Amino acid sequence: MHVVLAGGGTAGHIEPALALADALRRQDPTVGITALGTERGLETRLVPERGYELALIPAVPLPRKPTPELITVPGRLRGTIKAAEQILERTKADCVVGFGGYVALPGYLAAKRLGVPIVIHEANARPGLANKIGSRYAARVARLHAGQQRARRPLHRHPVRRSIATLDRAAVRPEARARFGLDPNLPTLLVSGGSQGARRLNEVVQQVAPWLQQAGIQILHAVGPKNELPQVQQMPGMPPYIPVSYLDRMDLAYAAADMMLCRAGAMTVAELSAVGLPAAYVPLPIGNGEQRLNAQPVVKAGGGLLVDDAELTPEWVQQTVLPVLADPHRLYEMSRAAGEFGRRDADELLVGMVYEAIASRR
């Protein structure tokens, strides 16, 4: 059996694909796995690091909204679809599993031409263009938000890597805090804007950090690899403020933290819910509003806070986040609510859908 994964560009598309790859290999160590990608995406680093084959195709970014540029997409896609077809034929693919983004659409269209079954994992409350098109031809579609009004806990969740799905935050916390140079006992705020960072979050946190430190809060802050690290002078007797470019071990970062300030990408919401880490979610103010919808269910369940990007200020952090970090009982209740909302076996559920799709072809 050979499965081709289509989801590249950002960690939000790549990590769930790799979580599925790991789950497939646990079930059948002989399964062949190839990930489609482009030379401009994070997959060029993340996929080989995890030991999987990466096959590159030309990048054809898709407009988020209808624009004049949309008219040119079909012509530019032809060569990319042909390249994807050649990869499916070379690998004798039994299934294409897509996670959205501009890498996924050529994979879907190539699979349709060749009669290869398609499984789509839609992480966002509002699907993007690639998954909207691909779902017309898919044998199975895993939707995180279908039936949201009827069920507090939808059937499908976002596959998360095994190191996070099996994480015991309390047991790992001493090791995690030591690794990052944090105090073993102080309340800890983790800040990250995702794999690329977020300038707005960075600016606000750098401004509010002295007030948080004076209140006894320590901070672990991933600013993003493309952003400059702030110059920090650690004051004797004050809780540490630790800025880093990128966190390669998010499992340890989650274990070290009591709360997180972050964007509301589907992967982030899923990982935090899976490990029971409460968060203050700041949805990205562009796109089609999917990040706000991603976070709303866990926030309504009591596992997080929600603030618009324009409303995120140092004063908001002081007035809203600081009281939570200073209240162990409230942190416990929010952690419990997030953990009850989350799901740790989404990768195995998706493996089942892959096998169903392949069986339906035979």
UniProtKB/Swiss-Prot annotation:
Coiled coil: none annotated. Keywords: Cell cycle, Cell division, Cell membrane, Cell shape, Cell wall biogenesis/degradation, Glycosyltransferase, Membrane, Peptidoglycan synthesis, Transferase. GO terms for molecular function: UDP-N-acetyl-D-glucosamine:N-acetylmuramoyl-L-alanyl-D-glutamyl-meso-2,6-diaminopimelyl-D-alanyl-D-alanine-diphosphoundecaprenol 4-beta-N-acetylglucosaminlytransferase activity; undecaprenyldiphospho-muramoylpentapeptide beta-N-acetylglucosaminyltransferase activity. It is a peripheral membrane protein. Its EC number is 2.4.1.227. It catalyses: di-trans,octa-cis-undecaprenyl diphospho-N-acetyl-alpha-D-muramoyl-L-alanyl-D-glutamyl-meso-2,6-diaminopimeloyl-D-alanyl-D-alanine + UDP-N-acetyl-alpha-D-glucosamine = di-trans,octa-cis-undecaprenyl diphospho-[N-acetyl-alpha-D-glucosaminyl-(1->4)]-N-acetyl-alpha-D-muramoyl-L-alanyl-D-glutamyl-meso-2,6-diaminopimeloyl-D-alanyl-D-alanine + UDP + H(+). GO terms for biological process: carbohydrate metabolic process; cell division; cell wall organization; lipid glycosylation; peptidoglycan biosynthetic process; regulation of cell shape. One of its GO terms (cellular component) is plasma membrane. PANTHER family: GLYCOSYLTRANSFERASE, UDP-N-ACETYLGLUCOSAMINE--N-ACETYLMURAMYL-(PENTAPEPTIDE) PYROPHOSPHORYL-UNDECAPRENOL N-ACETYLGLUCOSAMINE TRANSFERASE 1. NCBIfam families: murG. This is UDP-N-acetylglucosamine--N-acetylmuramyl-(pentapeptide) pyrophosphoryl-undecaprenol N-acetylglucosamine transferase. It comes from Streptomyces collinus.
